[in-house]
Amino acid sequence: MKVTLTDLSDIENLKKNLTDKTRVVYFETPCNPTLKLLDIELIAKTAHAFNPDIRVIVDNTFCTPYLQRPLELGADVVVHSATKYLNGHGDVIAGIVVGKADFISQCRMFGLKDMTGAVLSPFDAFLMARGLKTLDIRMERHCANAQKVAAFFTSHPAVAKVYYPGLDTFPGHEIAAKQMKLPGGMISIELKADRAAVAAALNKLQLCTIAVSLGDAETLVEHPATMTHSTYSAEELAAAGISEGLVRISVGLEDPEDIIDDFKTVLDTL
């Protein structure tokens, strides 16, 4: 198997890299952790125009089906880390693959039986079903809170940049308006500080929790350069748009003023 990495925010990059051997176009949107947005419909149309048999696979973890529905935009397969928003309570590790029946039957036969062998336990399945019952209510709250928290970050002098699809100034805001019901509960910010200062500041948070996961009821904060992307070289971090000052925030269900107060106390020290 050969994998080609390319920036799909420019559709010309996709066109240049499609070959007669291409079988899958795989991407996530919003992208982690920069929240760059990709046009699902445009990418799917371009790939299928080149070869209808190419499978377009979209990781929809950040949005869930409540905010974004890739299959309706032309994608063939959707994957979720169900550990995140779909479960929503931080107590299950699970994944979901969504697609046409013939494809899913292959996943069950060859993927589970011959390759991974992993299926959810009955109790984990119960917890997932429980979480899905409140998905719409939770996502509405995550998004409403994130919009308020993002607005606060835009006005704080310690913050150089705010990455949030709900801001008019965010590149790709038009794509969000086209394919997302709401802007989501994820925010990334660029702090005017070096790695040591950022770490010291984050360790002072009282309400918010430092953790690499996302989509929980609690607000979770992580420093990509030293946590989720710590294995990246300096060159790889730069190519991915990840600086030492970048902080990713999964805005939770708490009172938004409490979240803002926690961050204000910390950011005022920078």
Locations of regions flagged by a protein language model:
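Short amphipathic alpha-helical segments with coiled-coil-like heptad repeat character
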Residues: 148-154, 209-210, 257-258
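Hydrophobic side chains in well-ordered alpha-helices
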Residues: 106-107, 197-201, 259-263
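PLP-dependent enzyme catalytic core of the Aspartate aminotransferase-like
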Residues: 3, 12, 16, 20-23, ...
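Conserved C-terminal alpha-helix-loop-beta "cap" of PLP-dependent enzymes
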Residues: 161-247, 251
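Conserved PLP-enzyme active-site core in the AAT-like
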Residues: 1-158, 163, 169, 174
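A common structural junction motif
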Residues: 115-116, 205-213, 266-270
